[in-house]
């Protein structure tokens, strides 16, 4: 009924009855360096099966077998025999283990390695017979069919989501959409923005406009369900704002009565102003009303304004939106579009619980409470892949727009990146090396430079900006800073020690600075890595490395915007930061390009060292005087 168990003691039986004509030879000694789990299990089973036999006889058989297999000495065998004289169900396993350990102690590691290599060489020679393996072509993977990093979502909810891919070749003239767009809207686009689309604009307009126009002509009530919700992962500076603004203005172009039909939620006040400027240019010559709500304005005044004149489009931050919902300044009864820009940042922060509050009002304010009553458009350069965070938005038939790549994030197409590797011994001179690096790429650039430098903290921003100012004041004494002597250099810092008005003025001056030959430097933290649309930043420098690939994408995305050239420089100190940066690269798509090393001569003369030391002393005195004041 049951299969008989395996008895290792019977393994010697076939050897006794060898076929005739074959001369019996003693098998070569084999040293088992690593016991296999299956072997010990079989031996354990065998010891259980022979439990009714005397333990002494089994020990003697096992001892004889070990002497043949392993060539053990009499001294080792006697030790094992004494140990196995005690009856035990695991005597076989224990004796083999002790025998193996004793043999390994007597054999050197080099002998064991050489024996393994010799065996491997003999096996290879016997098996290959000087035959070479036929070369095989490299396996070609289709990115369209890959479950890549960007598609390795944290929930199976993404598996049934419609995915729409695009690439950098998808550029069209806006005139191709003459039959889909209102004539006045098309005129405003070509006049104020561009005559050609960006790839993300092309794919969204191709996917939405035909269905949108057809559905509006049939039934304005249910057009939101025909479109469904939209999620877009696109690089910074790729034209996302215009991509979602055009369908909104096209839909509301012929509206008769002003009602709140679109809410655009952004994370910062600076981004509010940029989106407002874009929509104002798009709606020129129309009766559409575009309003903003932000913390700088009086909440009471905004409440009065929104109650008296209901806008068609409202641009706000999540916290301010909650304030107006609580005060009943706005009603979502007629809402058709909900836009969430920089979605990953908004969804990672609660902002007074804005998301549950907004979804609750959509259920109570709207007469149509069925799913899909509002088109939700989610945009980000680093769109979250965590469906748990997106679940709170109650998405309806979402379409996910992705660049055709096997990476998690994509960088601007015209971005050039360089790594400046600083030896650990020279890290104390890092600010001086920063200025020297600027001298190097300014020597090959006849145009004015507008440089944005990212540091890790507010304190670092204040300290570095003042130190660079002190060094530049005495740059004539330095040999490495000779290229800066004839250039106007302006260095400022955006930090929390400044008032809001001061920071706003500094950013405005940096944005509108247009020296024909000079350097404008703005030092900041990651607060300016998002929502700053300054198209003529020539260089971004990561003085301190970012904490993640997501943060890196937003930093370097401040340059090479709107299909313009831009450069990013990474100052990496020692092997640790270089290794960390290599890990970041695994998530980034550069469209076939790579990060280039920038070789610099870090030899400093005595005059340079003295200049740096005196600047540090001046910085110390400055901070002491500031603290006393």
Swiss-Prot record:
Residues the record lists as Phosphoserine modifications: 73, 77-78
Domain Helicase C-terminal per the UniProt entry, residue ranges: 437-603
A GO molecular-function annotation: RNA binding
Region (Disordered) residue spans: 1-129
InterPro entries: DEAD/DEAH_box_helicase_dom, Helicase_ATP-bd, Helicase_C-like, P-loop_NTPase, RNA-helicase_DEAD-box_CS
Keyword entries, A-Z: ATP-binding, Helicase, Hydrolase, Nucleotide-binding, Nucleus, Phosphoprotein, Ribosome biogenesis, RNA-binding, rRNA processing
Catalytic activity of the protein: ATP + H2O = ADP + phosphate + H(+)
Subcellular location: Nucleus, Nucleolus
Membrane-spanning segments: none
Main localization of the protein described in the UniProt heading: nucleus
Chain residues that bind ATP: 234-241
Gene Ontology CC entries for this record: nucleolus; nucleus; preribosome, large subunit precursor
Residue interval(s) of motif Q motif: 197-205
Gene Ontology biological process terms from the UniProt entry: maturation of 5.8S rRNA from tricistronic rRNA transcript (SSU-rRNA, 5.8S rRNA, LSU-rRNA); maturation of LSU-rRNA from tricistronic rRNA transcript (SSU-rRNA, 5.8S rRNA, LSU-rRNA); ribosomal large subunit biogenesis
E.C. code: 3.6.4.13
Biased composition (Polar residues): 88-103
Ranges for domain Helicase ATP-binding: 221-401
Motif (DEAD box): 341-344
Keyword Nucleotidyltransferase: no
Acidic residues: bias regions: 72-84, 116-125
Subunit (UniProt): Associated with pre-ribosomal particles. Interacts with DBP9 and RSA3. Together with NOP8, URB1, URB2 and RSA3, forms an RNA-independent complex, which is required during early maturation of nascent 60S ribosomal subunits.
Function text: ATP-binding RNA helicase involved in the biogenesis of 60S ribosomal subunits and is required for the normal formation of 25S and 5.8S rRNAs.
Domain notes: The Q motif is unique to and characteristic of the DEAD box family of RNA helicases and controls ATP binding and hydrolysis.
Family under the similarity heading: Belongs to the DEAD box helicase family. DDX51/DBP6 subfamily.
Note: Present with 12700 molecules/cell in log phase SD medium.
Protein name (record): ATP-dependent RNA helicase DBP6
Name of the gene encoding the protein in the UniProt record: DBP6
């Amino acid at each position: 009924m049951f299969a008989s168990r395996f008895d290792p003691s019977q393994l010697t039986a076939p050897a006794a009855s060898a076929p005739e004509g074959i001369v019996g030879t003693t098998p070569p000694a084999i040293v088992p360096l690593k016991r296999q789990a299956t072997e010990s299990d079989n031996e354990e089973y065998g010891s259980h099966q022979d439990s009714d036999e005397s333990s002494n006889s089994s020990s003697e058989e096992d001892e004889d077998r070990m002497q043949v297999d392993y060539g053990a000495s009499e001294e080792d065998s006697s030790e094992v025999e004494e140990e196995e004289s005690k009856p035990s169900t695991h005597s076989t396993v224990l004796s083999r283990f002790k025998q193996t350990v004793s043999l390994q102690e007597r054999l050197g590691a080099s002998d064991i390695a050489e024996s393994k290599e010799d065996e491997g060489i003999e096996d290879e020679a016997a098996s290959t017979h000087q035959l070479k393996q036929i070369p095989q072509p490299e396996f070609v993977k289709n990115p369209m069919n890959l479950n890549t990093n960007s598609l390795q979502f944290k929930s199976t909810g993404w598996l049934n989501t419609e995915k729409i891919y695009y690439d950098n070749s998808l550029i069209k003239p806006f005139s191709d959409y003459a039959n889909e767009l209102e004539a006045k809207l098309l005129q405003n686009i070509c006049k104020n923005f561009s005559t050609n689309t960006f790839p993300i604009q092309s794919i969204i307009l191709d996917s939405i406009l035909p269905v949108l126009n057809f559905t509006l002509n049939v039934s304005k009530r249910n057009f939101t369900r025909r479109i469904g919700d939209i999620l877009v992962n696109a690089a910074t500076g790729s034209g996302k704002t215009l991509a979602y603004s055009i369908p909104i203005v096209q839909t509301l172009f012929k509206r008769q009565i002003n009602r709140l039909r679109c809410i655009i939620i952004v994370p910062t006040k600076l981004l509010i102003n940029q989106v407002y400027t874009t929509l104002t240019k798009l709606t020129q010559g129309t009766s559409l009303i575009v309003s903003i709500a932000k913390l700088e304005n009086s909440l009471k005044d905004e409440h009065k304004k929104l109650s008296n004149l209901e806008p068609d489009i409202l641009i706000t931050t999540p916290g301010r939106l909650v304030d107006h919902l609580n005060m009943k300044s706005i009603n979502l009864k007629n809402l058709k579009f909900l836009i969430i820009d920089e979605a990953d940042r908004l969804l990672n922060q609660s902002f007074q619980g804005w998301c549950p509050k907004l979804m609750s009002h959509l259920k109570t304010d709207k007469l149509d409470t069925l799913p899909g009553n509002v088109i939700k458009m989610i945009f980000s350069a680093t769109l979250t892949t965590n469906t748990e965070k997106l679940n709170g938005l109650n998405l309806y038939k979402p379409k996910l727009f992705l660049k055709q790549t096997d990476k998690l994030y994509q960088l601007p197409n015209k971005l050039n990146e360089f790594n400046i590797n600083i030896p650990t011994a020279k890290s104390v001179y890092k600010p001086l090396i920063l200025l020297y690096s600027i001298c190097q790429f300014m020597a090959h650039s006849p145009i004015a430079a507008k440089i944005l430098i990212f540091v890790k903290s507010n304190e670092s921003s204040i300290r570095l900006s003042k130190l660079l100012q002190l060094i530049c004041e005495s740059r004539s004494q330095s040999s490495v800073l000779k290229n800066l002597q004839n250039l106007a250099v302006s260095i400022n810092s955006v930090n929390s020690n400044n008032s809001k008005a001061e920071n706003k003025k500094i950013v405005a001056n940096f944005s509108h600075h247009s020296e024909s030959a000079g350097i404008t430097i703005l030092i900041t933290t990651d607060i300016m890595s998002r929502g700053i649309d300054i198209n003529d930043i020539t260089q971004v420098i990561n003085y301190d490395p970012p904490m993640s690939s997501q943060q890196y994408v937003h930093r370097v995305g401040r340059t090479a915007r709107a299909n313009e050239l831009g450069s990013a420089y990474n100052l990496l100190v020692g092997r640790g930061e270089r290794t960390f940066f290599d890990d970041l690269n695994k998530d980034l798509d550069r469209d076939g390009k790579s990060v280039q090393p920038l070789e610099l001569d870090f030899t400093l003369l005595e005059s340079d060292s003295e200049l740096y030391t005196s600047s540090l002393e001046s910085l110390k005195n400055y901070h002491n005087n500031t603290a006393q004041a």
